[in-house]
């Protein structure tokens, strides 16, 4: 799938604009602070109903405006189109509409418009807390395994019940045992989906990484959140007293992690910033391949400041891999001359100059 049309109103410093992007490569260039990243933020808002720059949405709404709105016309892989719209009012009301109907949740947006973000904060995937890697993992599982979301919702409900009981002791023994059973059943299902996903992801990631950079010995492994040699029911029973003292459940899928190691060390501790960026890109591109295989569709990639941290050789390699995905890509940079070479002649490339919030489409640099 791809975005055929994007309409943006009152998002940060952007002037109201309607964009007709290329179904493949789109390059947004201009000076720092011109609004390039805000375009990516608008697309992200359309696909996930949240910003990647702020946990609060009020800063996204343009000064002295009551609301921001993003509308998108999506070209579906199987043919036809779907119309998506999100609107956020300054008072807090959030509206999501799909083909003229109010959506039940942001998950419906995510399913229709699978987005991959690569930006300066992407290093957190390697350096940050396990929660960030779980989000990466679960994004991938969500898009290839339709049974994942109901199982994840069951897990969250069981965890809330158990944690409430641990803090307040409000459940009788029979109810406590019932919720523990539900927690274990949902956990086993989640663990199975995650393990299957990592099994499929690893060879694609390794192949993709090898085309970007030589990092012999880099390993990707999955920790499920409790001892691999013990049943979760046994672990919960043995840690009950400590769980009560802590007020939450310490073992289970909510503690899962992905581990990237090189020469026995955490990869983030020994890789350069450029190498870390390439590892993250390889992970994101590998996910895109799996989405294509499972859904017969494509992710949309948002790549903020692609040239940073990379020399010419690695920039070209990354662009080639993004091009080979045959998906829609939005790339920001200060100087588009850094990205002018390397695209195949038949690949449609659109250029957009961004200056003080105004966006102007310019000629394909190959013409």
Swiss-Prot record:
InterPro entries for the chain: DNA-binding_RecF, DNA-binding_RecF_CS, P-loop_NTPase, RecF/RecN/SMC_N, RecF_2
Source superkingdom: Bacteria
A molecular function (GO) term: ATP binding
Subcellular localization(s) per the UniProt record: Cytoplasm
Residues annotated for ATP binding in this entry: 30-37
GO CC terms in record: cytoplasm
Record keywords: ATP-binding, Cytoplasm, DNA damage, DNA repair, DNA replication, DNA-binding, Nucleotide-binding, SOS response
GO biological process terms held by the UniProt record: DNA replication; DNA synthesis involved in DNA repair; double-strand break repair; SOS response
Location (main, coarse): cytoplasm
Family per record: Belongs to the RecF family.
Job of this protein: The RecF protein is involved in DNA metabolism; it is required for DNA replication and normal SOS inducibility. RecF binds preferentially to single-stranded, linear DNA. It also seems to bind ATP.
PANTHER family in the cross-refs: DNA REPLICATION AND REPAIR PROTEIN RECF (PTHR32182:SF0)
Alphabetized HAMAP family for the sequence: RecF (MF_00365)
Annotated protein name in UniProt: DNA replication and repair protein RecF
Organism from which the protein derives: Pseudomonas putida (strain ATCC 47054 / DSM 6125 / CFBP 8728 / NCIMB 11950 / KT2440)
Highest classification ranks of the organism: Bacteria, Pseudomonadati, Pseudomonadota, Gammaproteobacteria, Pseudomonadales
């Amino acid at each position: 799938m791809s975005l055929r049309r994007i309409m943006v109103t009152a998002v940060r410093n952007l002037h109201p604009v309607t964009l007709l992007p290329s179904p493949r490569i789109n390059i947004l260039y201009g000076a720092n602070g011109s609004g390039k990243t805000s375009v990516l933020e608008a697309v992200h808002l359309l696909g996930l109903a949240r910003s990647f720059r702020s946990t609060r949405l009020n800063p996204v709404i343009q000064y002295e405006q009551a609301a921001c709105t993003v509308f998108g016309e999506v070209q579906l892989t199987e043919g036809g189109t779907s119309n998506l719209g999100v609107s956020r009012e300054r008072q807090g009301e959030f509206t999501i509409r799909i083909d003229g109907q109010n959506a039940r949740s942001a998950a419906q947006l995510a399913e229709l418009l699978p987005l991959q973000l690569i930006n300066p904060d992407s290093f957190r995937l390697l350096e940050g807390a396990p929660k960030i890697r779980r989000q990466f993992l679960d994004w991938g599982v969500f898009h290839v395994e339709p049974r994942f979301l109901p199982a994840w919702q069951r897990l969250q409900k069981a965890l809330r019940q158990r944690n409430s009981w641990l803090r307040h002791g409000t459940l009788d023994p029979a109810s406590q045992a019932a919720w523990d059973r539900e927690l274990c059943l949902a956990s086993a299902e989640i663990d199975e989906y995650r393990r299957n996903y990592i099994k499929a992801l690893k060879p694609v990631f390794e192949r993709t990484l090898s085309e970007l950079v030589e990092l012999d010995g880099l390993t990707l492994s999955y920790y499920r959140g409790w001892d691999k040699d013990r049943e979760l029911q046994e672990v919960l029973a043995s840690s009950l007293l400590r769980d009560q003292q802590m007020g939450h459940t310490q073992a289970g899928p909510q503690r899962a992690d992905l581990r990237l190691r090189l020469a026995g060390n955490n990869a983030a501790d020994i890789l350069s910033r450029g190498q870390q960026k390439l590892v993250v890109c390889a992970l994101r591109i590998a996910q895109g391949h799996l989405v294509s295989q499972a859904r017969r569709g494509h992710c949309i990639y948002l790549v903020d400041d692609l040239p940073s941290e990379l020399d010419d050789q690695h920039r070209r390699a990354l662009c080639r891999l993004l091009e080979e995905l045959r998906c829609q890509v939005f790339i920001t940079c200060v100087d588009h001359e850094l990205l002018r070479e390397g695209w195949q002649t038949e690949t449609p490339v659109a250029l957009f100059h961004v200056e003080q919030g105004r966006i102007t489409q310019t000629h394909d640099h190959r013409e």
